[in-house]
């Protein structure tokens, strides 16, 4: 299923704002198969590059995982809306089952996040994500999340 959401449309669903909104676009959303594909354009203007690391700027791995989680949260909230669950929701981290970092992400990179729901229930879910730059996997993780009504 083809789908597109720009950053303004993402902010209608997710509560995150600058400097912590870490996805720029949703390229695909398939609620029947619980899959989402999102983009993060990494620029040298990101605040974290001031100290991580000035001589070799690398995006912190925890922020790559957070961006992956935000893509998963977008999917979970849209799924809840499709199922008729009313109200505003926030998706909270409930755990990181596993995470691996394969290559550094640097300014100028575009990260493609491919996230799928492995076991999504009404208010809890497990998601699996892969982050890629130029077709190469830079990180992967299995995350737990909880859907909480605001």
Spans of features found by a protein language model:
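HotDog/MaoC-like acyl-thioester-processing domains
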Residues: 2, 35, 77, 105-109, ...
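Catalytic strand-loop segment that frames the active site of acyl-thioester-processing enzymes
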Residues: 18-59, 64
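Short aromatic-glycine motifs in intrinsically disordered, low-complexity regions
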Residues: 7-17
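Small/polar/charged residue-enriched interaction surfaces, especially the RNA/DNA-contacting tracks
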Residues: 3-4, 16, 38-41, 91, ...
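Hydrophobic beta-strand-centered segment that forms part of the acyl-chain substrate-binding groove
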Residues: 1-4, 73-112, 138-140
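Conserved positions in beta-strands of structured domains
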Residues: 24-27, 97, 102, 116-118, ...
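Active-site helix/loop of acyl-thioester processing domains in fatty-acid/polyketide metabolism
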Residues: 26, 59-85
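Beta-strand-rich interaction surfaces with strong enrichment in secreted/lumenal proteins
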Residues: 11, 55-56, 100-103
């Amino acid at each position: 299923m083809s789908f597109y959401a720009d950053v303004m449309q993402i902010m209608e669903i997710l509560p995150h704002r600058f400097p912590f909104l870490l996805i720029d676009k949703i390229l695909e959303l398939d609620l029947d198969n619980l899959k989402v594909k999102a983009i993060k354009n990494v620029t040298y203007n990101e605040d974290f590059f001031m100290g991580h690391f000035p001589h070799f700027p690398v995006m912190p791995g925890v922020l790559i995982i957070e961006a992956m989680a935000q893509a998963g949260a977008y999917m979970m909230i849209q799924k809840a809306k499709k199922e008729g669950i009313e109200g505003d929701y926030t998706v909270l981290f409930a755990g990181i089952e596993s995470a691996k970092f394969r290559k550094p992400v640097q300014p100028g990179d575009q990260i493609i996040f491919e996230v799928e729901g492995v076991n999504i229930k009404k208010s809890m879910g497990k998601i699996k994500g892969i982050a890629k730059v130029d077709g190469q996997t830079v990180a992967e993780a299995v995350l737990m999340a909880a859907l909480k009504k605001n």
